[in-house]
Amino acid sequence: MKLTFLGANHEVTGSCTLLEAAGQRYLIDCGMEQGKDVYENQPIPVAPGEIDGVLATHAHIDHTGLLPLLVRNGFRGRIYATRPTAELCSIMLRDSAHIQEFEAEWKNRKGQRSGAEPVEPMYTIQDAEAAIALFRGYDYNKEIELAPGIVIRFVDVGHLLGSSSIEIWVTENGTTTKLVFSGDIGNHDQPIIKDPTYLKDADYVFMESTYGDRSHGPRPDYVAELAKILQRTFDRDGNVVIPSFAVGRTQELLYFIREIKEKNLVTGHGCFPVYIDSPLAIEATRIFKDTDSSCFDEETNALLAKGIDPIQFPGLKVSVTSDESRAINTDPVPKVIISASGMCEAGRIRHHLKHNLWRKECTVLFVGYQAVNTLGRSLLEGADNVKLFGESIEVQAEICQLTGLSGHADREGLLKWVNSFEPKPKRVFIIHGEDEVENIFAQTLTEQGFNASAPYNGEQWAIGAEGAVCLKEGTRIRIEHHVSEGAARAATVFQRLLNAGKRLLRVIEHNEGGANKDLAKFADQINALCDKWDR
């Protein structure tokens, strides 16, 4: 058999791997890159019409977003996924296609004035519909024969509703080899969904490494942390704007806010309104509610048994139309606005940032991973000014983050997952991580006795009775992004340090009036940090 690494190698988006075995060709994921590329994804080395099927680990666009393009270019095979993943993809791919069409239309309107050539969307709603029609949904833990010599099974990996690791048994020349693709490995104790499943055996493992170089630390009390942020923002008559992934993270936030309201943890603001301003998030919430309870954790099932909807509460409002979305920012009542996209690269969240970033009384709360070169990452790293819709916006709002709130396992979680294999796999391929993170995690595994490597896009391996052999090295050439001299200066590491200092000052200002005990602890921590670095 042969494997070709096509995307999300030494970067975290655009997942795609080609498996050629037993006379068949299958893609494991077919994701869209988000943010600026670090390394160019490689073209699929065979015609889309020659691919027999796609195995989707979960519904996030960085794992499924190029399926409509694959279909547009001639793919007609089946797309295999869990039932919830198939359901979620039915809304997420339509939404992605809508964004493609909208952006192309906007560029063409703008380009007409300058005489630019018209642009075509990457794919259309029709392409997305055609891809959705090819999905086949399956239950967890059920063996599925794709073709003679190829059997797969989806197991819950606790990252997102429907997310899975995929076990693949390939039989060639009378010998069976087992591959495991981890998918995105989930964090422990997330609301609603189950914890990751730990597998016992595999010959070759392909695993993600998003947080392979860091720990989430002790799990905070997210409900208490979120309640404090809401309280102090509402007390200064501001809005809490939360850029959130429409699927998974939004429902997690609703779970937390329901508990905050049930326990009256935010006082003096009545039944404060909470807006879901994302048609996709609204549809995803419906799918969560309609999903079989066997996909949920014990706590969620206990609530359901009592007749409690875990993601519903008084004051929850949804805005579907553009007019409803615009009306949110004309209402002076302090509120929570949850909107997509989670990295602020597209969607209605950009309008809410435009209306709230410049207001000192407001808070922008990040609740998920922010990839390099995204607007969300820039704000977290202390940007003073950002451009939205061609307009320069001064950043005066409080910028904060619920740290550790992640759908991805941290370093310890990843190590626990890979160490569940007994005996150790013959080789572990490290994928889906930022450039240096993949190298660091591969080195960590090597030190623990694993045979580990981090392939680059385009790398090709043969796996057979003699083991795994690299047939072709991947490309290590970085994509050069043209930036102005001023932007280049802003991207330096020292500038990041200055921005972090400015952010610290804003956080100090926002803590004015806090409890003396908390302020003293904060001051001690800052002084200890200064003592460490004052050279």
Name what the model sees in each region:
Residues 1-55, 60, 64, 71-252, ...:
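His/Asp/Glu-rich metal-coordinating catalytic cores
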Residues 100-105, 292-305, 387, 469-492:
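A polyampholytic, Gly/Pro-enriched intrinsically disordered region
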Residues 150-154, 287-295, 415-417, 465-475:
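Short, surface-exposed amphipathic charged segments that create phosphate/polyanion-binding patches used
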Residues 185, 218-223, 312-324, 343-345, ...:
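A general structural motif
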Residues 191-206, 293-300, 370-396:
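Short, compositionally biased "basic patch" segments
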Residues 229-374, 386-387, 422, 437-439, ...:
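Hard-cation-handling environments
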Residues 387-418:
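Generic long, charged, amphipathic alpha-helical segments
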Residues 458-518:
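Charged, amphipathic alpha-helical linkers/stalks
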